[in-house]
Amino acid sequence: MKLLHLDSSILGDYSASRQLTASIVAKLQAADPALQYTYRDLAANPIGHLSGAHLAAAQNPPATRTPELANDLALGVQVLQEFLDADTVVIGVALYNFTISTQLKAWIDRVLVAGKTFRYTAEGALEGLAGNKRVILAVARGGRYGEGSPTAALEHAETYMRAALGFVGLHQPEVVVAEGLALGPEARAAGMAAAQAQIDALPV
């Protein structure tokens, strides 16, 4: 079994989502020490954003590509293969200005690939090709954006990830949420404790 672990927070050791993904991964590894583990820190080692050069590369001979573009395209192939090969994917999702980090968006753009993770049928219907992976999202939010809160409509991180994963056929991600983390020390401690309880309840 292969485990892919992704962190995307820019906050380093202060990051709540990193603490949560580490706890989730530790639980999974304790249950199966033979797990093949791949880690990618999308903030420390960001993936380049797509550009017109990437689109043009598909239409032109490889010999016309600059070394920088060739290396970037090779990284994209590697990132996609890591996702395709994984049986379980654990993703740290920090909420920035109502949505995911730009670093995580760059990763999403490399794994939502027509013909690889989704396709359209002859009738025009969407078909996800990502298989039956287990996906666990560790969502960290400074405020309170949960269902029923006044700001719930502004939450576009968890909702975006659910949409992107559903697009490739992964419709049932497991979601751990820590929120209220920027509302003071007590609120942060309570939010992290609630998230850890969710992790403790995850099946292995």
Curated annotation (Swiss-Prot):
A GO term, aspect molecular function: FMN binding
Pfam families reported for this sequence: Flavodoxin_2
Function: Quinone reductase that provides resistance to thiol-specific stress caused by electrophilic quinones.
Origin species: Xanthomonas campestris pv. campestris (strain ATCC 33913 / DSM 3586 / NCPPB 528 / LMG 568 / P 25)
Record EC number: 1.6.5.-, 1.7.1.17
Protein name (Swiss-Prot/TrEMBL): FMN-dependent NADH:quinone oxidoreductase
Broadest EC class assigned to this enzyme: oxidoreductase
Family that this chain belongs to: Belongs to the azoreductase type 1 family.
Details of cofactor binding: Binds 1 FMN per subunit.
HAMAP family, per database record: Azoreductase_type1
Membrane-spanning parts: none
Keyword Flavoprotein recorded: yes
Quaternary assembly: Homodimer.
Binding site for FMN: 9, 15-17
SUPFAM superfamilies (UniProt xref): Flavoproteins
Catalysed reaction equations from the record: 2 a quinone + NADH + H(+) = 2 a 1,4-benzosemiquinone + NAD(+); N,N-dimethyl-1,4-phenylenediamine + anthranilate + 2 NAD(+) = 2-(4-dimethylaminophenyl)diazenylbenzoate + 2 NADH + 2 H(+)
Essential cofactor(s): FMN
Alphabetical list of InterPro entries matching this protein: Flavodoxin_fold (IPR003680), Flavoprotein-like_sf (IPR029039), FMN-dep_NADH:Q_OxRdtase_AzoR1 (IPR050104), NADH:quinone_OxRdtase_FMN_depd (IPR023048)
Keywords linked to the UniProt accession: Flavoprotein, FMN, NAD, Oxidoreductase
